[in-house]
């Protein structure tokens, strides 16, 4: 974090600029935009941009446009358009009537390209893509002029019109801006404005055989929509001179200004759209909404509340310098949000059966359990207690170390909402594995307190063997094992333990709950019901643990 980020105050350098522009009268109102390309699913980085652009508009009484940058028809699909709109709404924002597409402006963009040609500031180039790349030069060497750079205006206009009409094959010609092949900024070395592409467009069909570049479409679309503050990430900082060049040389209706902020980088995470696509296509994950993915669809399926994501983004702030945020900050925001909202239930992830030998056979009783310890208004529920129960395997050790206070032979513990129990006998199978515990209970300790004042050092959760419901429990961890995964070798850094699937037992209330919202499994973490659930088959995803277990594992292995 830099000193330019003032997240605690809810202000940052971009908001300061907006406030100053409004105070000075430079702008009467603020208009921002979020302009995704519909060629994939939104991820954490997009969430930061969404919250910034929509948040600024909301805070300053303006509006934010949702504009799809649909200038590459071979990569764009309606599936992504629909998903992006769902994700923006899920985050809590609404573009109202301001839904736009760059393709809405294709005719105007074409006319402006002709304007540049007539002014001698654009030309048709017959060179191949590779020849153009080689002639562009390097950071230390100037570029070389195209042999077609001085084509007559009339010839350029004719060729450009024929490009549009579809007379030439893909790659045969491009339209380039005529700026400065010796510029120290490579983006100003006669960038491509249009390329030939014989491909149907999702919205315009086969009407166009040429498509504008992002750099040409972006700023002019901003101007058409009267965007006041065009906010993007730092990798576009070197594109700003080109953004301004187009606005300076075209009869545009308004003059937006581009501002750049640091993109979001998170530990144990890669946000490259290319890598995310390869993860999906390579079968490393189960789709774009796999709960391990940093996509907004994946976060939703994992059970992350939009409120937690907005709070996380608010806390990391907006800065001018790139940095990496510990994923633990996101986990903290999730825990803090869910701690307030999630009802409590009991679930045993790795069941170990216990038999309470002095509890009457064939009998059971109802006990009262609170739904939320900090909110009495959430009420209570009834849970059934009987002779046979399930506890966590991890809550028993036959030969415990000094600081292990849970169940062991001869030790007494408290069962939550129920009684004190003592382990009397350990039952093992032929392989020597513990399969059952024989215990006794103290009937006088109902509710969890002993009349004689004796204390126990552990309270454990449990479920009734007679009434518990089987459930598949999916424990999700970091997708990448290393904190700073190498994008070039991402496949080798995948965490082999990023998903563990367990066969657990849960209290029957979880089968009756008709909500897909989050729930806290007491002493375990926050979980949500997965869409794979069906009648007779419960599936739960872990959203986040109650504490940072990863840090403990990492420390133990170091």
UniProtKB/Swiss-Prot annotation:
GO terms for cellular component: cytosol. Coiled coil: none annotated. A motif ('HIGH' region) lies at residues 36-46. Pfam families: tRNA-synt_1c, tRNA-synt_1c_C, tRNA-synt_1c_C2. It is an enzyme of class 6 (ligase). Its EC number is 6.1.1.18. Its main location: cytoplasm. It catalyses: tRNA(Gln) + L-glutamine + ATP = L-glutaminyl-tRNA(Gln) + AMP + diphosphate. ATP binds at residues 37-39, 43-49, 233, 263-264, 271-273. It is found in: Cytoplasm. Keywords: Aminoacyl-tRNA synthetase, ATP-binding, Cytoplasm, Ligase, Nucleotide-binding, Protein biosynthesis. InterPro entries: aa-tRNA-synth_I_CS, Gln-tRNA-synth, Gln/Glu-tRNA_Ligase, Gln_tRNA_ligase_bac, Glu/Gln-tRNA-synth, Glu/Gln-tRNA-synth_Ib_cat-dom, Glu/Gln-tRNA-synth_Ib_codon-bd, Glu_tRNA_lig_a-bdl. Belongs to the class-I aminoacyl-tRNA synthetase family. HAMAP family: Gln_tRNA_synth. Monomer. This is Glutamine--tRNA ligase.
């Amino acid at each position: 974090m830099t000193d330019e980020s003032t997240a605690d105050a809810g202000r940052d350098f971009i908001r300061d600029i907006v406030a100053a522009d409004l105070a000075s009268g430079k702008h009467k109102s603020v208009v921002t935009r979020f302009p995704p390309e519909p060629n994939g699913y939104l991820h954490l980085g997009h969430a930061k941009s969404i919250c910034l652009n929509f948040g600024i508009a909301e805070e300053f009484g303006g509006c934010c446009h949702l504009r799809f940058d649909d200038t590459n028809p071979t990569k764009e699909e309606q599936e992504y358009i629909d998903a992006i709109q769902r994700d923006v709404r899920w985050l809590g924002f609404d573009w109202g009537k301001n839904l736009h597409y760059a393709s809405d402006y294709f005719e105007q963009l074409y006319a402006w390209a002709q304007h540049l040609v007539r002014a001698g500031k654009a030309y048709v180039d017959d060179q191949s893509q590779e020849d153009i790349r080689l002639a562009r030069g390097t950071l230390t060497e100037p570029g070389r002029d195209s042999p077609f750079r001085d084509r007559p205006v009339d010839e350029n206009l004719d060729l450009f019109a024929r490009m549009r009409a579809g007379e030439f094959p893909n790659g045969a010609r491009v339209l380039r801006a005529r700026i400065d092949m010796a510029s120290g900024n490579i983006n100003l070395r006669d960038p491509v404005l249009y390329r030939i592409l014989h491909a149907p467009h999702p919205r315009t069909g086969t009407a166009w055989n040429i498509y504008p570049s992002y750099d040409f479409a972006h700023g002019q679309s901003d101007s058409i929509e009267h965007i006041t503050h065009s906010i993007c990430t730092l990798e576009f900082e070197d594109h700003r001179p080109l953004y301004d060049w187009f606005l300076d040389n075209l009869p545009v209706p308004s003059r937006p200004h581009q501002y750049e902020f640091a993109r979001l980088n998170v530990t144990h995470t890669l946000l490259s759209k290319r890598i995310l696509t390869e993860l999906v296509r390579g079968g490393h994950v189960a789709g774009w909404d796999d709960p391990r993915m940093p996509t907004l669809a994946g976060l939703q399926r994992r059970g992350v509340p939009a409120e937690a994501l907005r709070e996380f983004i608010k806390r990391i702030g907006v800065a001018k310098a790139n940095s990496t945020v510990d994923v633990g900050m996101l986990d903290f925001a999730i825990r803090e949000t869910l701690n307030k909202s999630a009802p409590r239930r009991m679930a045993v992830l790795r069941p170990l059966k216990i038999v309470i030998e002095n509890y009457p056979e064939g009998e059971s009783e109802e006990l009262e359990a609170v739904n939320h310890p900090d909110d009495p208004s959430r009420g209570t529920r009834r849970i059934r207690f009987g002779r046979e129960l399930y506890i966590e395997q991890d809550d028993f050790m036959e030969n415990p170390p000094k600081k292990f206070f849970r169940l062991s032979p001869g030790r007494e513990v408290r069962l939550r909402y129920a009684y004190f129990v003592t382990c009397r006998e350990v039952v093992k199978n032929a392989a020597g594995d513990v399969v059952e515990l024989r215990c006794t209970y103290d009937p006088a300790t109902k509710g969890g307190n002993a009349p004689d004042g004796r204390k126990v050092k552990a309270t454990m959760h449990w479920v009734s063997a007679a009434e518990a419901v089987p459930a598949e429990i999916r424990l999700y961890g970091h997708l990448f094992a290393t904190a700073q995964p190498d994008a070039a070798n991402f496949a080798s850094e995948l965490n082999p333990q990023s998903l563990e699937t367990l066969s657990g037992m849960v209290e029957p209330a979880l089968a009756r709950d008709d909500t897909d919202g989050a729930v806290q499994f007491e002493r375990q973490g926050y979980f949500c019901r997965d869409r794979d659930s069906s009648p007779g088959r419960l599936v739960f995803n872990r959203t986040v643990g109650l504490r940072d277990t990863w840090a403990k594992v990492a420390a133990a292995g170091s």
